[in-house]
Amino acid sequence: GIALTVDGAEFRTYARQVLDQASLLEERYKNAKPRKQLCSVSTQHYMFAVEAFVEMIESTKSDEYEFTIRETRTKDIINQVANMLSEIGIIYLSDFNKDVIGKLLREKHLEFHPLFRAPLHVFISRDNPLAGKKKVTMDDLKPFPFIQYEQGEEGSFFFAEEAVWPEYSPKQINVTDRATILNF
């Protein structure tokens, strides 16, 4: 009879694995139906991002999809995109933070593409005494609490979502989610 050498037996083992994998590939793609549409977005706490996300879902024509939106801290957004947990990250970039955030993006091999330039704005209730004013100054805001998004232990002013900071605010509230703000 015939006997395989050690090398021959090893070759046969690898050849079987290759043939099995080829068979799995053929089975997978032979009668393939369209795959589930996937999309993950990590964003700072912006209403426009949520509205765009909802619009994207509503315009999806796929029968199967899995979409994820994560409202989170700036550094987490960058890490989630770098680690491919999200395809897109939405962050605020300004003259103040562009050097620090730009450096971090380069280190993570990520690119920043501006969506738009937004003027500064203040969110206030229609019952707020400032609601009727066309323009609001920092002095106008002094009697009110300054609400800011918490950026965690590693957070710094450079990762903040707020565009301006009061010189001094005796009333300060730190939040982690946008919904909490609606209660103030």
Segments (PLM) and residue ranges:
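Basic, amphipathic "hinge/linker" alpha-helix immediately C-terminal to the N-terminal HTH DNA-binding motif
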Residues: G1-Q21
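Hydrophobic residues within well-ordered alpha-helices
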Residues: T5-G8, V81-A82, L141, N183-F184
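N-terminal winged-helix
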Residues: R16-D20, L24-E27, A32-Q80
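Flexible hinge/capping segments at coil-to-helix
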Residues: K33, L104-L120, I124-F146
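Short, well-ordered beta-strand segments
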Residues: L38-Q44, G89, F123, I147
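Secondary-structure junction motif
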Residues: A49-E55, K98, L130, K134, ...
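Short beta-strand-centered segments that line the small-molecule binding cleft or hinge
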Residues: V54-S59, K75-L120, I124
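Hydrophobic hinge/microswitch elements
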Residues: R73, A82-E87, Y92, Q151-F184
